[in-house]
Amino acid sequence: MIGKEVILQDIVLELSELQPEVQPVDLFCEEELPTEQQETEEEPAIERSAYKVVVLCGCCKVKLRIFVKATQFGIRTLQDILIEELQLLCPECRGNCNHGGV
């Protein structure tokens, strides 16, 4: 740069001057992106089965039934949660219990 003002010739660099072996890349190459149909075909189908889950209310011990559709892993996880961490409540008991653990 010569002088106080910057001119375009001072900024633009020619790659051929720096590295003569650098060649421009053709961005319109022959590659194709997969279509949505191809993407969905590649995903394995997740097998879900219907289950009836019977548990006792956490307060009054009345039988509660819920119906779910889950994977084998999902139903086992739900079983573990219901046994160890979570209790379902019937509609009558939900009004009697404090919400949010308070």
Curated annotation (Swiss-Prot):
GO terms for cellular component: host cell cytoplasm; host cell nucleus. A zinc finger (unnamed) spans 57-93. A motif (LXCXE motif) lies at residues 27-31. It is found in: Host cytoplasm; Host nucleus. Its main location: host cell. Residues 1-43 are annotated as: E7 terminal domain. The gene is E7. This is Protein E7. SUPFAM superfamilies: E7 C-terminal domain-like (SSF161234). InterPro entries: Papilloma_E7. Pfam families: E7 (PF00527). A motif (Nuclear export signal) lies at residues 75-83.
